[in-house]
Structures are given as structure tokens and as C-alpha cells.
């Protein structure tokens, strides 16, 4: 079968290879891939910045945003049958089975020994077929066929926003306004979730107000700003007191600014990674004083587990019901598996690129 693979640590090594089609064990499911999403992680893998091949392999099949259909279920599998739509979770428990992993929360793993399909120590989903244990597969209703490939990134934001509301149980909290920094796929999904729970939401990016990102945001009643024209500080002034900020750019500078722009008793959720180790001058006393005197909370979030995927199904359904067809507009480009390298070449209008694998 065909698969998209890299040599970990080697720049621009992405290529399509031929590998044996996997065979499911008695307790496994064989899934035929339909499509995979491309994200910044895949770009970092191809740049050689991150990535770890499975033990005994010199290559890594990439792909973690996925949608497939059950081709065959092992004889001991009862939960799935041929033709079922499924999305697979990504992170797997560490070998030492820390407390978080033992309790079904590998996304909160206490060690760095966890595995991630398509990223760290396990082959991913950008292949014609893969096998998986049924407990790692999420059933998808046919009504979500066109957008379910967004479930994995949405699950990450679903987790972050859920945690924010859980943390804010420290008081009686009635949030009204939220700002999402960044309008990429994670940012747009965060903004849509916050709109879905009833908040007034704004977002910003470097694209114009005529861009696809802006049009998607504004179609859901999310106010969009071009940060090149309206600085983040001015956005906060225009929007009024901000109860919550979701940082989805990966800019540490913006992350620190977000703390100061959040209103008293507010919360900042950090979802963006900052791998470049840049430094900025920050008044650390000012940050500490602001956090303490105004009861602010800041936390980071990464990955997700089965619970967030399952809740994500309900969220996708709700968003589709409220804004029909809006999620599908995020798919700005589609490429075939054999042209996967084209999918990693950025286009100024890209929001989410899909790699089409099967019919």
C-alpha cells in the first residue's frame, strides 16, 4: 500500500513509499483511510525538527488528523463492523503506565515516554490502511462525513476550553467575552466553540478582512481583526473586558500580552507551541503583580483523550446545525496522497489542507 513517510531528523525527507498492508489481529480493526488533515506538526516533521520512528524502523509514516472507514474487524471485535466511519485518537500511554495513563488520560502523561501516532514512536494515518484497537476508535455518524476529519484538532480545543471552565469553578463565573489569538484551524475551531457556548468572540490574524479566515469567522458572528492594522492592545480596548483569551499562534510574546489584556478574574488558555526559543524583554514583576492582584489564571494544554473526541462529535454536530456548511469551508485545498508534498507547501489562503486517500 501507499503511505506518506519521513526520515526523522532529516529535512525535506517526505515521500510516498510502498509498504505492506497491515493485517488486523483478533482484537484489532483494519481501517481504510479516506482523508487526512495537514497541520503545522506535519510541517515540523518534514523539517526534521520533531519526529521519532517506531522501534526497529528507519522511517515514520506521518498523519494524525484522520478519517477512515472500517474495512475489516477482527473476530473478537464487537463494537465495529465493515462500513463504519471512524476517527482514531492519537496519543498512547507510556510504557511505565503513569497514573494519568492508567486512568485513561495519556494526554496528561507524567513522563515524556508516551507514544503518538504519526509523530512519536508509532506510524500515523497518512496511508491507505492502518490497524487499531477498538478502544482507540471513535464512531462517527454519517451526518458528519464531510467534516469529521476536523475531530482531532477540535478535540484539543474542546479539552482546553473545558479545562478553562473547570478552573473557573474557583468562583461564580459568568463570562461574556473571549478573544482568540490566531485564526488558523485551532484558532477558528476555538472561536466556534466559544460562540457555540454563548460568548461574544473576536479573533485576529495577519490576513486581510477579505481573506477566507475572516469570512469564516464573520459568518459565525465572530469579529475578525487584521492585527497588522489593529494592534492586539487596541482590539482588547474595542472589545471591552475580556473574560478569556485562547492563545493559538505559538507566539510567546502574544502569550505574555494576553495575561495583561485579560480582565480581572479572567483566564488565559495557551495552546500554541513556541519551539524557536526566542527571547523577549518582559517586566516580570508587572506580570506577577497583575496575576496576583487581579486573580488571573493561566494554563497550557496539549493533546486530548477519548473523552474529548467523544464530546467533539457532539460539538461538530452542534456547529453544523447552527452554521450549516461553515466547517467545510475551512478545507481550502485538497491534494491526493501521491502529491502530499504539495499539501505542505503553504498558500496565503490556506486554512486547512486535506490529503485525499480513499473514496
Swiss-Prot record:
Q: What are the protein's GO molecular function terms?
A: D-glucose binding; glucose 1-dehydrogenase (NAD+) activity; glucose 1-dehydrogenase (NADP+) activity; NAD+ binding; NADP+ binding; zinc ion binding
Coiled-coil spans are none
Q: Does the keyword Hydrolase apply?
A: no
Q: What is its EC number?
A: 1.1.1.47
Question: Which residues take part in binding Zn(2+)?
Answer: 39, 64-65, 152
* Cofactor(s) listed: Zn(2+)
Q: Cross-referenced InterPro entries, in alphabetical order?
A: ADH-like_N, Glc_1-DH_arc, Glu_dehyd_C, GroES-like_sf, NAD(P)-bd_dom_sf
- Does the keyword Zinc belong to this entry? yes
**Alphabetic keyword roster:** Carbohydrate metabolism, Metal-binding, NAD, NADP, Nucleotide-binding, Oxidoreductase, Zinc
Can you tell me which residues bind NADP(+)? 183-186
A single GO BP term for this record reads:
non-phosphorylated glucose catabolic process
**What's the catalysed reaction?**
D-glucose + NAD(+) = D-glucono-1,5-lactone + NADH + H(+); D-glucose + NADP(+) = D-glucono-1,5-lactone + NADPH + H(+)
- Where substrate binds, per the record, is at 41, 116, 152
Which family would the database say this protein is a member of? Belongs to the zinc-containing alcohol dehydrogenase family. Glucose 1-dehydrogenase subfamily.
This chain's function reads:
Catalyzes the NAD(P)(+)-dependent oxidation of D-glucose to D-gluconate via gluconolactone. Can utilize both NAD(+) and NADP(+) as electron acceptor. Is involved in the degradation of glucose through a non-phosphorylative variant of the Entner-Doudoroff pathway.
Listed name of the protein: Glucose 1-dehydrogenase
Question: Could you tell me which species this protein originates from?
Answer: Methanocella arvoryzae (strain DSM 22066 / NBRC 105507 / MRE50)
Gene label: gdh
